[in-house]
C-alpha cells in the first residue's frame, strides 16, 4: 500500500486545521474532513452522549471507526490526500482526557500508516475560538498540541510545524511539501 501519499494534518483545536483543509480542497487538493466534528454533530442531534465532554471512550471508539474508514477511503482513491487528523489522534484524544489507550486503538494507530512526515498546527491564541462543537479552553487546546506531538512521535512520525501565517501562506507551505504545487 502506498501510504506515503496520505498526509495528516493534526494539532490542537482552534489552530486553523479545518480552515486550511477547506482552502486546500478549494485549491484542488484531495482532502478528508475531521471525523470528530461529524460525530459530535450526530450525537448532539440524536441526544447521544458519545461526546468529548461526556463519554470520552465512546466518542473515541466512534472516531476510531471513522478515522480507519477515512484512511482506507483515501488509500482507495489513489490520490495524494490531506486528512484532517489521523488514527493516532484518537490515542492522543484519550491521553489528553486522562484515559488509557486501549489495545484496539493502539493497534489501529500502528496499522493505519500515513506519510512519515505529519503536519501539525501549533496552538495559536490569536485565532483560537470556541463553538458548540469545540468546547475546549485555550489551555486544553495548547495541551492537546503537546500531546499530539508526543503521540505522533511515539508512533514513529516526524512532525512538521505549520507556520503561524495567513491561510494562503499555509496552503502554499503545505502544497510545496506534499508535491501538489
Language model features by range: what are they?
Residues 20-21:
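Post-Walker A alpha-helix
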Residues 12, 24:
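P-loop (Walker A) phosphate-binding loop of NTP-binding proteins
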Residues 16:
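Conserved glycine(s) of the Walker
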Residues 9:
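Hydrophobic anchor at the beta1->P-loop junction of P-loop NTPases
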Residues 60-113, 128:
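Glycine-rich phosphate-binding loop used to anchor ATP phosphates in small-molecule kinases
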Residues 25-68:
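Conserved substrate/cofactor phosphate-moiety recognition/catalytic segment
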Residues 98-165:
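A glycine- and Lys/Arg-enriched "phosphate-lid" helix/loop adjacent to the NTP-binding pocket
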Amino acid at each position: 500500500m502506498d501510504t506515503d501519499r496520505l498526509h495528516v494534518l493534526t494539532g490542537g483545536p482552534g489552530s486553523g486545521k479545518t480552515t486550511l483543509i477547506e482552502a486546500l480542497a478549494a485549491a484542488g487538493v484531495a482532502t478528508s474532513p475531521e471525523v470528530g466534528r461529524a460525530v459530535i454533530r450526530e450525537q448532539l442531534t440524536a441526544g447521544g452522549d458519545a461526546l468529548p465532554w461526556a463519554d470520552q471512550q465512546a466518542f473515541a471508539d466512534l472516531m476510531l471507526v471513522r478515522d480507519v474508514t477515512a484512511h482506507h477511503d483515501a488509500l482507495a482513491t489513489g490520490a495524494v490526500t490531506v486528512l484532517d487528523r489521523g488514527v493516532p489522534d484518537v490515542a492522543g484524544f484519550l491521553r489528553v482526557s486522562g484515559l488509557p489507550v486501549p489495545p484496539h486503538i493502539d493497534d489501529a494507530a500502528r496499522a493505519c500508516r500515513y506519510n512519515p512526515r505529519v503536519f501539525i498546527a501549533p496552538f495559536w491564541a490569536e485565532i483560537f475560538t470556541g463553538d458548540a462543537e469545540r468546547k475546549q479552553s485555550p489551555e486544553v487546546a495548547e495541551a492537546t498540541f503537546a500531546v499530539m506531538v508526543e503521540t505522533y512521535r511515539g508512533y514513529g512520525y516526524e512532525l512538521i510545524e505549520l507556520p503561524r501565517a495567513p491561510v494562503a501562506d499555509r496552503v502554499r507551505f503545505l502544497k510545496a511539501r506534499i508535491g501538489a504545487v
